[in-house]
């Protein structure tokens, strides 16, 4: 019996006006895969894609083809024929269906990519604009339009004086933007990877086994460019397709990993067929953290199964190249030790055998920057070795890899890849103009260093608004005043008591981000007994940071993915790239160091089009000068979402929050909020640290604990002093008894 229907039977309210709590819970990310992973869709674009997928033509067919179609329809629609004729027509229809199926299978295997109908430029523009995909040619205008400018001018007008050439008007900014815009063929479905782009049959089967059917926006735009190449003179069939260098800015959880793995694997499979004897590392994928690198390897192993391609995670002590100077050193050491005894020779040879590991036999190497640099330079003791076979370098989370922390290491790896046809692709959800300029200058330097006459296009693909959060999650910015207020608000999330509609309801599993490792440890110790023993107790909450060993980190990640851990307290170690598809929300216990970090943190929920994710950010009095950039991102995200009703960020709040100077932004990005920095320099900083301490213990209890620790330390010091002054330990000799 429905109580709502009973109480509202005299009204005109619809039965579905008040959704039940069970219905609202079904919209959580943890409930399962979204029906459509795309973030931006429109009916017009769907119509164009449907027509392209079924091979329909928009114009009416005329002539003999139309007459044949009419004859076929007349033959099929014979309603008044005899029963024998109907049976014969039915058997003929079955035979025709079988023949058509066999022909279709044969066509899928043997047909060329040119036989597949391509969209015209208007259709491509419609689809790309509807999905908010913008592709731009980043090269100089002289490289983009040299042929076009010459072809438009007649031969007589080519002979000009210098004065006339100087007087020619330059393109306006609007015309330059228009000249740089590119409209490549979009990917209609994953089936096209086999029919149009001729990827490996086994790779196509592996993609289908993973359940990928509808491409996301980033896959819709990048896969045709990386598999089919970029045609410099438009979509004409006569134009030569060239694989471009690519900069991709796409929202978190939009499928960037699959977008760069499929072309890399397919390229290596083709190379294996063309040159069977040549083996080595053909692609290098660089990621900023071990967690992200291991995740890429796990996804890659699902795709390379049965293809003959090997993908490997870089580990400490692995040998990547065979250095000639290593052999020279070994031979030199052998010559110098010829005069040594046989007993000394045996352990030295065994030591050499143990110390020299075999070279890694892999096609794709996934690594963090420092590990590969140390392997190529023998822990910075020798010049960098080269990777001559590498044809693709992929920088995942490129804005971090080309930032100050990893920049030198990443550029060293890039320079070590010496193949003249090396293609680079940079991927991230946030990418500043300085990163784009650095990538552009690095590619230009390589071109000059290797005297490359052939110009490769450099394209930038942006999905949605650049450097913005995904629109399918709900953002909450909560003022907690003090550290104790944040702790109280977090406990209210864990144990919701109020029934107000405006209150935030966040169900596990979720992530909690802090600024530093000590704060993450302190918050974990404070919350570990908040979950009742009936629900699993302290085993349901864990802390993850870079001070833990690799084994501990992988074990925590495994338990969190399995669902044994519900709440994970962590630092920005997990803020980038790591894919937790079932996370219901993210809590920023400490505000992020920059707007880009906020975008990546909240992007751990709402992945692959899942709706219902919540991002809660607590801020205190000390955080007020740094909050405006986060508030702006939330405001833009809500506008992009088209959210109706009351917004979480009001205009008066945006006007009241102070702007941050460039110097302060740089300081915040490097060190975080000053009040929460772990290093203490003065008494004033000590007082600030006390105010931002994560603890609910009283001052009396803390003093008693400190006294106890001091007594234990004093006892240890006394014991060590007595042992050092023990007469039995003196070195003085005994002269015997005097007579």
UniProtKB/Swiss-Prot annotation:
Domain topic, free-text comment: The Q motif is unique to and characteristic of the DEAD box family of RNA helicases and controls ATP binding and hydrolysis.
Its biological purpose is as follows: ATP-dependent RNA helicase involved in 40S ribosomal subunit biogenesis. Required for the processing and cleavage of 35S pre-rRNA at sites A0, A1, and A2, leading to mature 18S rRNA.
Q: Where does ATP bind?
A: 250-257
> A biological process (GO) annotation for this entry?
maturation of SSU-rRNA
**Polar residues composition bias: which ranges?**
18-29
**Enzyme Commission (EC) number:** 3.6.4.13
The gene behind this protein is rok1
Q: Which family does it belong to?
A: Belongs to the DEAD box helicase family. DDX52/ROK1 subfamily.
Enumerate the InterPro entries for this protein: DDX52/Rok1_DEADc, DEAD/DEAH_box_helicase_dom, DEAD_box_RNA_helicase, Helicase_ATP-bd, Helicase_C-like, P-loop_NTPase
Please identify the protein, giving its name as recorded.
ATP-dependent RNA helicase rok1
Indicate the quaternary assembly.
Interacts with the U3 snoRNA and is associated with the 90S and 40S pre-ribosomes.
Pinpoint the Helicase ATP-binding domain residues. 237-449
Return one GO MF term: ATP binding
Bias (Acidic residues): 67-76, 323-346, 728-739
Residue positions of motif Q motif = 192-220
The entry's localization annotation reads: Nucleus, Nucleolus
Q: Where is it chiefly localized?
A: nucleus
């Amino acid at each position: 019996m429905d109580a709502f229907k009973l109480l509202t039977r005299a009204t005109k309210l619809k039965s579905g006006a008040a959704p039940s709590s069970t219905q609202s819970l079904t919209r959580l990310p943890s409930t399962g895969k979204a029906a459509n992973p795309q973030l931006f869709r429109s009916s017009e674009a769907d119509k164009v894609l449907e027509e392209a997928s079924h091979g329909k033509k928009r114009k009416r067919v005329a002539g003999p083809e139309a007459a044949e179609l009419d004859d076929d329809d007349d033959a099929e629609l014979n309603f008044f024929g005899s029963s024998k004729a109907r049976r014969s027509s039915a058997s003929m229809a079955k035979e025709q269906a079988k023949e058509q199926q066999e022909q279709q299978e044969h066509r899928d295997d043997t047909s060329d990519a040119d036989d597949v109908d391509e969209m015209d430029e208007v259709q491509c523009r419609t689809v790309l604009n509807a999905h908010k995909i913008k592709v731009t040619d980043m090269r100089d205008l002289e490289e983009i339009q040299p042929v076009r400018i010459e072809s438009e001018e007649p031969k007589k007008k080519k002979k000009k004086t210098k004065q006339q050439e100087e007087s020619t008007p330059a393109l306006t900014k609007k015309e330059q933007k228009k000249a740089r815009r590119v409209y490549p063929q979009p990917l209609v479905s994953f089936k096209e990877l086999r029919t149009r782009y001729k990827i490996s049959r086994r790779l196509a089967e592996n993609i289908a086994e993973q359940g990928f059917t509808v491409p996301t926006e980033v896959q819709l735009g990048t896969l045709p460019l990386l598999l089919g190449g970029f045609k410099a003179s438009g979509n004409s069939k006569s134009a030569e397709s060239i694989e471009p260098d690519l900069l991709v800015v796409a929202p978190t959880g939009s499928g960037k990993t699959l977008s760069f793995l499929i072309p890399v694997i397919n390229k290596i499979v083709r190379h294996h067929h063309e040159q069977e004897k040549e083996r080595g590392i053909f692609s290098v994928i660089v990621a900023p953290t071990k967690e992200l690198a291991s995740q890429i390897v796990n996804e890659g192993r699902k795709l390379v199964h049965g293809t003959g391609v090997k993908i490997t995670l870089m580990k400490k002590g692995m040998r990547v190249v065979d250095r000639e100077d290593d052999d020279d050193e070994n031979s030199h050491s052998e010559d110098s030790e010829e005069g040594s005894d046989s007993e000394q020779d045996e352990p030295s040879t065994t030591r050499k055998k143990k110390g020299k590991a075999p070279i890694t036999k892999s096609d794709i190497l996934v690594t963090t920057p420092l590990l590969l640099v140390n392997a190529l330079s023998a822990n910075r003791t020798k010049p960098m070795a080269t990777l001559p076979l590498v044809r693709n370098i992929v920088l995942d989370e490129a804005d971090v890899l080309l930032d100050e922390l990893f920049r030198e290491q990443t550029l060293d790896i890039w320079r070590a890849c010496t193949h003249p046809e090396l293609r680079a692709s940079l991927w991230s959800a946030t990418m500043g103009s300085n990163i784009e300029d650095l990538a552009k200058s690095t590619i230009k330097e390589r071109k000059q260093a290797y005297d490359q006459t052939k110009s490769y296009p450099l394209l930038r693909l942006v999905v949605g608004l650049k450097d913005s959060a995904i629109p399918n999650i709900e953002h909450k910015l909560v003022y907690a005043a003090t550290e104790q207020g944040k702790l109280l608000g977090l406990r209210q999330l864990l144990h919701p008591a109020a029934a107000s509609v405006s209150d935030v309801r966040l169900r596990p599993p979720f992530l909690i981000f802090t600024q530093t490792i000590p704060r993450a440890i302190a918050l974990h110790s404070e919350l570990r007994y908040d979950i009742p023993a009936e629900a699993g107790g302290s085993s349901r909450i864990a802390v993850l940071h870079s001070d833990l060993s690799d084994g501990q980190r992988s074990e925590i990640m495994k338990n969190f993915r399995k669902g044994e851990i519900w709440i994970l307290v962590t630092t920005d170690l997990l803020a980038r790239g790591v894919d937790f598809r079932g996370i219901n929300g993210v809590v920023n216990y400490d505000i992020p160091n920059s707007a880009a970090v906020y975008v990546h943190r909240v992007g751990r929920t709402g992945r692959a089009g899942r709706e219902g994710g919540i991002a809660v950010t607590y801020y205190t009095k000390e955080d007020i000068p740094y909050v405006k950039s986060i508030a702006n991102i939330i405001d833009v995200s809500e506008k992009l979402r088209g959210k109706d009703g009351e917004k979480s960020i009001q205009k008066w709040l945006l006007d009241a929050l102070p702007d941050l100077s460039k110097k302060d932004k740089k300081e915040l990005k490097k060190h975080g909020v000053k009040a929460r920095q772990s290093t203490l320099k003065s008494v004033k900083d000590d007082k600030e640290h006390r105010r931002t301490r994560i603890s609910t213990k009283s001052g009396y209890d803390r003093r008693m604990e400190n006294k106890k620790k001091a007594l234990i330390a004093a006892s240890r010091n006394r014991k060590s002093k007595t042992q050092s002054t023990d007469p039995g330990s003196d070195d003085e000799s005994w002269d015997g008894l005097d007579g």
